[in-house]
Amino acid sequence: MKNILVLCTGNSCRSQIAEGYLKQYLNGKALVFSAGVNNHKINENAIKIMKEDGVDISNHTSNHVNEYENINFDYIITVCDHAYETCPAFYSNELTTRIHKNFFDPSSINNSSNVEKAFRKCREEIKKFCYDFSKKFN
């Protein structure tokens, strides 16, 4: 079975959303993990907007990338530029496929009336990315 790591800055939003969709779309074809180069509490808005789409991430935990240093990953997917630039080299080898896609950080929105809209926009972008990835996955 293949191992996939989704990496972000804080493992609080974008990587959690991607982990949820990848698990759903791959349906047991791979082990999917998410982590952050720093770890923060999972963003409640991420949990809420995923629940709207029928994906429950409320039981996910926020993990630091160092927790996975002994796992050989087949894919490392970075979902923000900061994680891409700071991802430790020991998480990949010559067989690891690295994929980078910088998604907008909805938690950076401070205007409360636009927060849910920003999270939904981010969710839909990540959902499409994960769906497309799952269709090419082998």
Outline where the language-model segments fall:
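Residue-level detector of flexible, active-site-proximal loop/helix-junction positions
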Residues: 39-41, 83, 105-107
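Local beta-strand N-terminus motif with an aromatic residue
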Residues: 73-74
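Structural signal for conserved beta-strand scaffold positions within catalytic alpha/beta enzyme cores
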Residues: 34, 78, 99-102
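Glycine-rich, flexible loop/turn motifs
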Residues: 38, 61, 83, 99, ...
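Short glycine-rich anion-binding loops that position phosphate/pyrophosphate groups of nucleotides
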Residues: 12, 81-84
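Conserved active-site segments centered on acidic
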Residues: 1-68
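Glycine-rich nucleotide phosphate-binding loop and flanking beta-alpha elements
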Residues: 57, 83-86
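Phosphate-binding/catalytic loops
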Residues: 86-138
